[in-house]
């Protein structure tokens, strides 16, 4: 490769990445998932597009995609709160194992019939497209404001279901290559190996990386590089030992993100940029790899297969997988069924048969790509609408304009939150002493126009003021409500109820006020929060609703595992 070729690659790569970034702003305006934008730019630059770039290097695409996935999952793991496992771990694992098997099996049987393949080849197609994609789920769920049970289940499922899909794909490829037509006991051994080694290497590697980061004295800019290189090492080691690198790197990130770690803010900020670059690079490469003209001959059967998987196989697998978990209501189950987003992972798995030289490998690849396109366009574009229809969007609290980590104490993560007060904020005109600031937070600075003011208790807030607040991550919900817009209060009332009650109130007092018909066996001395927990069962989350005794009871606030506020609304009969 000469210097001119190398420079041309730099030029083309820079133009494609810049175009992806600039055109990403159209995603929200057009209601198209941003990943589709990246994919479309890659396809336009490819052989059948305006760019005419001939790219069919499957090993290179496999390399780029796996590297990108490792970075995306490391970042996703760091941003997943361990507290979400309280409500979602076991349901997500059920979907990540039994759910994938059911989806792959049902989809594979129909694929064999539609494309006139034998059963094993059909099941291989089912295995390739059987898992949801972490990159797509993390990207499309971000900022949707879903209740914690649903969002955590979908995120943990997408981060942990790839081992099952990889295991099924690799096993079926080996069977086809060896001419086998039935399953053997090695099927179970490979499954245990994928999950077991992925978990062990991910947790051990994450623990060692955490220890190394906290022990080393480095320049601040080197900590993120150490973290990402360590995560890729964990991914590569698990994969080399025939474990799940995807699960390992996700668990590594989860451990780093939920333990005290040096320069946490700097690591997260760097990871944010790396994750975006990884998504852009991965979908550009996959778009270049695809020739849209190859999809036309299979369009009708591939569309039928996509609809079968989306409308039947995925919902059935979700309803079966969530049968033991009564905390999920019907609306949540239906929504989880709909968010079976496919993305880069099925396309990467479809490269496996190409590299193994299997017959019909091109067909497997094109079908997988077609299913991914249908999933992103159909499910991805309707995600917000489906969430609203299912009434799973919890009224958001105001997020700061920006947040900056203060690397003062590794065990006590202080941050600076920046809030800008527009005219619709209810606190405009209030004095600082009137604000009920969360305990332990401080207003460090107040900017008015170009001037830095010295805030005192008598300082009145005005439109356009910029507040710099020192606090910690757990203070964000209270600060968000403090600086929220007035319309959000009305939204809270519509969603949570006509009245919001303190959960520490005695049930006996509440029953007298609202005329509740309590059964004799109910302890009237318990608190409202304890009684609501009894009504819901399982692990409640903010936004959970239940109708009882002519009233709708909604969990409005929680502190750790404890219900702190409950919304009450009178049930009205709809004509």
Swiss-Prot record:
**Subcellular locations according to the entry:** Cell inner membrane
Q: Which GO terms describe its cellular component?
A: plasma membrane
Per UniProt, what is the membrane topology? Multi-pass membrane protein
Q: Where are the bilayer-spanning segments?
A: 3-23, 30-50, 58-78, 95-115, 122-142, 172-192, 194-214, 221-241, 244-261, 270-290, 293-313, 334-354, 363-383
Q: Which Gene3D superfamilies match?
A: 1.20.1530.20, 3.30.465.10, Regulator of K+ conductance, C-terminal domain
Which BP terms from GO are recorded?
Answer: cell volume homeostasis
All residue ranges annotated as the RCK C-terminal domain in the record: 403-485
Keyword vocabulary terms for this entry: Antiport, Cell inner membrane, Cell membrane, Ion transport, Membrane, Potassium, Potassium transport, Transmembrane, Transmembrane helix, Transport
Answer yes or no on keyword Glycoprotein.
no
A Pfam match is Na_H_Exchanger
Which molecular function term from Gene Ontology is one that the record holds?
Answer: potassium:proton antiporter activity
Does Membrane appear among the keywords?
yes
Q: What is the reaction catalyzed?
A: K(+)(in) + H(+)(out) = K(+)(out) + H(+)(in)
* Stored SUPFAM superfamilies: FAD-binding/transporter-associated domain-like, TrkA C-terminal domain-like
- Please give the function described in this protein's UniProt entry: K(+)/H(+) antiporter that extrudes potassium in exchange for external protons and maintains the internal concentration of potassium under toxic levels.
What does the similarity note say? Belongs to the monovalent cation:proton antiporter 1 (CPA1) transporter (TC 2.A.36) family. NhaP2 subfamily.
Record's protein name: K(+)/H(+) antiporter NhaP2
Gene that encodes the chain: nhaP2
